[in-house]
């Protein structure tokens, strides 16, 4: 017998086979993502009632993302005993949300200078991914947090949620999907890590080893 149905397509067009999110159950609440904008939702598991939602503001980076429909879930951590939901967006931002209210965590990350973004609780992952990458360092243009990486240089996004381990939020990424790649070179898919309490950058694992790293 079906107890209740939660309509994910209330948060954007139905995405058929591409909707792959696995809900996470923590302290009596279900958490998931839904829709092309990867809206985060907290759900009462007894009734199916939506307790809160968060949807990232529109950006050019989101419009260009090839992983809009591929959000697979969220991660959970704690800051001084306070439950925190971590998720990565198709535009490649890391968000830290209060598990009870859905509001962004104070003192985490840095302000993203884009309309609609909160003053705190967000990390622009592109900044750290591009840092020390030679093609970007040679690119004679200022960084635009709305536009992201120029197509001439590459493309990067993410579909998987981060993981939280030993006080660290670890973030992966995704390049172009499928077997029909459009470029020979792309942004390296390096793994990024951040402090779970502050959002401060901790380390980067180079998938393509740099001199002296092998």
Where are the regions a protein language model picked out?
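Surface-exposed, flexible loop/turn segments at secondary-structure boundaries
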Residues: 38, 59, 93, 113-116, ...
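Short acidic, glycine/serine/threonine-rich loops at helix termini
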Residues: 97-99, 181-182, 214
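Aromatic (tryptophan-biased) beta-strands that constitute blades/sheets of beta-rich domains
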Residues: 1-14, 49-64, 103-151, 200-208
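Structural core of flavin- and non-heme-iron oxidoreductases
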Residues: 41-48, 54-57, 76-77
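Repeat-blade elements of multi-bladed beta-propeller folds
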Residues: 16-39, 65-93, 154-181, 188-190
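Beta-propeller blade signature
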Residues: 47, 91, 97-102, 186-201
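Extended catalytic-interface subdomain
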Residues: 171-172, 192-214
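N-terminal export/assembly segments and adjacent metallocofactor-ligating motifs
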Residues: 5-6, 41, 46, 175, ...
